[in-house]
Amino acid sequence: ILFVHGRRTFQWTAAERQALRKYVESGGLLFADSICASSQFAESFRREMRLTFPEQVLRRLPTEHELFTSDFGGFDVRQVTLRSPASQQDSSPSRINELKVTPHIEGIQLDGRLAVAFSPYDLSCALENQVSLECRGYIQKDAARVGSNIVIYALQQ
């Protein structure tokens, strides 16, 4: 399992894309998340997936995907809590909205297995217990469960 995350725009070289493709086609999993739901990182990651796997499409996993269930020894994460900064109109204190949602995980399937798993919402800061009022992502407990499911699921494919 190769884990990458970030918050800024990035670009891989042709050699890096080729090495990543070889790793994934050899059975590896690329697991990525966008720190604090950074749109810059998410756009860069999606572009790099199009360039690395031009014949594949990174698409959102459906709600009924086995990854979100406990069927394989993971957690039932079909509903999780997403923290989202509340918009402020004045100088009032910052607030967080907590929404019950289905996890947003995008994936690429190769030969019938999940080869790339990407969360456009933050997982890693929550896993590090770095909670910020400006950070859009899953609460710590749910981030741990979603991340665990990705790892457990990948190891059983």
Set out the residue ranges of the language-model regions.
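Short, low-complexity, polar/charged sequence segments that are solvent-exposed and flexible
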Residues: 21-24, 50-52, 77-80, 134-139
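Aromatic-Pro/Gly-enriched surface loop or interdomain linker
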Residues: 1, 5-9, 123-157
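An acidic, glycine-rich "communication" segment
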Residues: 41-129, 144, 148
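Mixed-charge, polar/low-complexity N-terminal
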Residues: 4-5, 10-11, 89-91, 96-98, ...
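Short alpha-beta junction capping motif
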Residues: 3-42
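Solvent-exposed, flexible loop/coil residues
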Residues: 1, 5, 14-16, 65, ...
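Structural recognition of the beta-strand scaffold that forms the well-ordered cores
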Residues: 1-4, 29-33, 57-60, 115-118
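Sec/Tat-exported extracytoplasmic proteins
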Residues: 6, 28, 49-60, 154-157
